[in-house]
């Protein structure tokens, strides 16, 4: 059974790569854009929407050297064999890899995220029930104003001890 440790990773100044310019790659890139404006997306073709993101778009087929100097890579192609090869290339270079839709190959997964100002709420299911994670994240988002308004009660209790 897969077991993922929920952590926050400092990506400041780190090289992040997304391989794949389709629907899944665009989804990952859109989320990533909330946290950084520095990433490179590699794909022979790009779905509409990529041009609105702050990332460098490289229109070409993947090559192993694309991972040189990278910190992490999101592998989002529609070719399962290519995804496995990119994962092997990442391992050989010590690059953390997330293979979209293949959690058994992932070094990390991305939780369902809600972010407001400097607060980030992440809900994960160890890649077993993504839709449930998203539903819980949505419930938190939909009730956030109420929760935030009452958080001062929790803060005052915390500071008393």
Model-derived features with residue positions:
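Hydrophobic, well-ordered beta-alpha structural blocks that scaffold small-molecule cofactor pockets
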Residues: 1-45, 50-52, 59-60
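Alpha-helix C-terminal capping/helix-to-coil transition sites in glycosyltransferase folds
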Residues: 12-13, 68-70
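Residue-level detector of alpha-helix initiation sites
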Residues: 23-24, 80-81, 127
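Short basic, glycine-rich beta-strand/loop surfaces that mediate nucleic-acid
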Residues: 71-77, 107-128
